[in-house]
Amino acid sequence: MFLPQEIIRKKRNGEALSTQEIQFFVQGITNNTIGEGQIAALAMAVYFKDMTMDERVALTCAMRDSGMVLTWDHLNLGGPIVDKHSTGGVGDVVSLMLGPMVAACGGFVPMISGRGLGHTGGTLDKLDAIPGYQTSVDNDRFLKVVKEAGVAIIGQTGDLAPADKRIYAVRDITATVESIAMITGSILSKKLASGLEALVMDVKVGSGAFMPTFEASEELAKSIVAVANGAGCRTSALLTDMNQVLASSAGNAVEVREAVRYLTGEYRNPRIHAVTMALCAEMLISAGLASDDGEARRKLQAVLDNGKAAEIFGRMVTGLGGPSDFMERYDHHLPKAAIVRPVYAANSGFVTAMDTRELGLAVVAMGGGRRAAGDKLDYAVGLTDFIRLGQSVEADKPLALIHAQTEEQFAQAASMVQAAVKIGDTRPEALPEVYRRIGLADL
């Protein structure tokens, strides 16, 4: 029998907690015998004193096991269970293309996603722009759609990693969100509760990233790779660029529109194509569906070219309550803003930098993201047709198109976009889309 206050004291003093102590504390969080004050105290102790990798594995597994862990054996799927998680950014609509592409290559992707957080867009908010699409379903429906379509993207259900929900709510209001040990546990407990065989992490770097520096992003990627593999799930990570908006658009309906156009081949932004292909290839190799990068990319290009990936996206949408003709009539089904107008630069030159975070906040300011937890979103607003880093800017060349509902919204978004896009006389060096891969061998 342990005492919560003694576990807190031990961590406060910088000692490593045993697996049994961590399991006891997480069980207490799950059954409400440990209160918010004690959760907050342990979170702050971990923030200052950190956790060893063994402690992080124990925390992640205890949080994973605090609720239901999905099993897939009884479905006889005939393919590996594999997923991707992104630390979030602006215009990061990768999941909507990646899930169907990997499914079309023989993987099964049970993706449990999140809502928008701060300046970053949430995959669930994007899917909510599709009429009828249900992001909150029971586990039976989730398993059924994964089996039939090969992919389902839904929100966290109450019975998956419930301890994480309580811990996160306390971290959010006690300035302990930034602990890499606790971020690792929070991300992985939810992902591993899906019963994955392989996971690929997309850790963002740059002005629109969650982690403030390249070093912090690298540290998070290494922590996740070490802990996930320690918990028995084959995991690698890619560090990808978020120094500019990833897609051509940022918002909810506007990003779904771009995802559909990508899958059908109507338009593929080269940056998001590079990141999506790199992550998908990593997933196929990790899951044993391709032997190397070349084979993986050939398979992925084939399912884009033959329409199989697009067909699977349509099947997932229908399976989760969306329109049966969504892929054919997506433009009809997705909401549109009242005002769609360009914003121009005040002077000419080259785009030298972008405050990507500020561009995300411009979408939030128009109602496309949340200021408070219960906010209702306007799915139609957003930004599209972004200029890229290094492009030349003239007086008649728009920085972006603004999709707003009122003139007031348009004016505010326009000034935020103009402030966020830095213009100078010298063209900057091009940044890579993918900086590096981190696997077990790199730890």
Swiss-Prot record:
Catalytic activity: thymidine + phosphate = 2-deoxy-alpha-D-ribose 1-phosphate + thymine
Record keywords, A-Z: Glycosyltransferase, Transferase
Known pathway: Pyrimidine metabolism; dTMP biosynthesis via salvage pathway; dTMP from thymine: step 1/2
Pfam families assigned: Glycos_trans_3N, Glycos_transf_3, PYNP_C
Domain of life: Bacteria
One Gene Ontology term, aspect cellular component: cytosol
One of the GO BP terms on file: pyrimidine nucleobase metabolic process
EC number(s) from the headed UniProt entry: 2.4.2.4
UniProt GO molecular function: 1,4-alpha-oligoglucan phosphorylase activity; thymidine phosphorylase activity
Job description of the protein: The enzymes which catalyze the reversible phosphorolysis of pyrimidine nucleosides are involved in the degradation of these compounds and in their utilization as carbon and energy sources, or in the rescue of pyrimidine bases for nucleotide synthesis.
UniProt family annotation: Belongs to the thymidine/pyrimidine-nucleoside phosphorylase family.
Subunit description: Homodimer.
Name of the featured protein: Thymidine phosphorylase
Lineage of source species: Bacteria, Pseudomonadati, Pseudomonadota, Gammaproteobacteria, Aeromonadales
